[in-house]
A protein has these predicted regions:
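Charged catalytic and DNA/RNA-contacting regions of genome-maintenance
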Residues: 1-252
């Protein structure tokens, strides 16, 4: 624990090192408290669920990714709590490493029973991504569908383009559950979800991005000296994020 005024100094360091941080605040005036002052956890900050200006690079999305496997099909759902972006889709399980490289998440959620299968795949792609194990009952279709329809205030998921994605819905439910738990349900701006088609983009694997120094320099891993640092003359955070998406995964659409 540390004083509230030291939060901005310690929180970024802890989260960037992969720690989960529970922010606890006093809920009553110490002068009027009987005994120990009442305190409650008001927010849980993790690498994939952060909204603080001190932690985020606002020209880069901070994605939380959930992965669920069933019969060689991988359901993937990624979100950015700071922007309200929320997607879900399915691929063959052999394509998981490529998709992790495309999304570049800060944190990945997996079911406890699938950790042994997914952890080696994730770590082979990147050693720096935080892997969080979630209770298996959360990765179920009925729970995921109920949670999503309640969040979007709808009777079904028709119209979002994911109603036939069983594994995708399971992954999206786990993603949303994690956001609700860490943000204490303060996620009303997350009001829609959409499908995602990775075949619409030319995907570059991690080693190619590294060797071409597209988004980071090989010398120190920083942004300076990379292609994006030269191209980026955007004036807003949204513009910076959009440019990074275009450079990292070029659209296959020809106009």
């Amino acid at each position: 624990g540390f004083p509230h005024h030291a939060l901005d100094a310690y929180l970024p360091k802890l989260v960037r090192n992969g720690y989960r941080v529970a922010v606890c605040e006093q809920m009553e005036n110490p002068k009027f408290a009987k005994g120990i002052v009442k305190r409650e956890v008001v927010e849980v900050v993790t690498p994939g669920v952060a909204i603080s200006d001190k932690i985020l690079d606002h020209k880069k999305n901070n994605y939380l990714l959930a992965i669920y496997l069933e019969n060689e099909i991988a359901g993937l759902s990624f979100s950015d709590i700071s922007t309200g972006e929320f997607h879900s889709y399915e691929v063959h399980q052999n394509d998981i490493p490529q998709q992790i490289g495309l999304i570049n998440p800060s944190e990945i959620l997996v079911a406890k029973k699938q950790k042994g299968i997914l952890e080696p795949v994730i770590q082979k792609t990147s050693q720096s991504i935080t892997i969080t194990k979630i209770d298996d009952w959360i990765f179920t279709f009925d729970y995921g569908e109920e949670l999503l329809t309640k969040q979007f205030n709808t009777l079904s998921l028709k119209g979002f383009g994911i109603e036939n994605l069983r594994c995708g819905i399971i992954a999206a439910g786990a993603n949303l559950n994690y956001l609700r738990e860490t943000q204490k349900e303060n996620i009303s701006h997350l009001n829609k979800i959409s499908g995602y088609n990775p075949s619409d983009y030319m995907v570059l694997d991690f080693s190619t991005k590294r060797n071409l120094e597209i988004t980071f320099s090989m010398s120190d891993g920083g942004r300076e000296g990379s292609l994006i640092s030269i191209l980026d003359h955007t004036q807003t955070a949204m513009g910076g994020r959009m440019l990074k998406k275009w450079v990292s995964a070029r659209s296959e659409e020809h106009t």
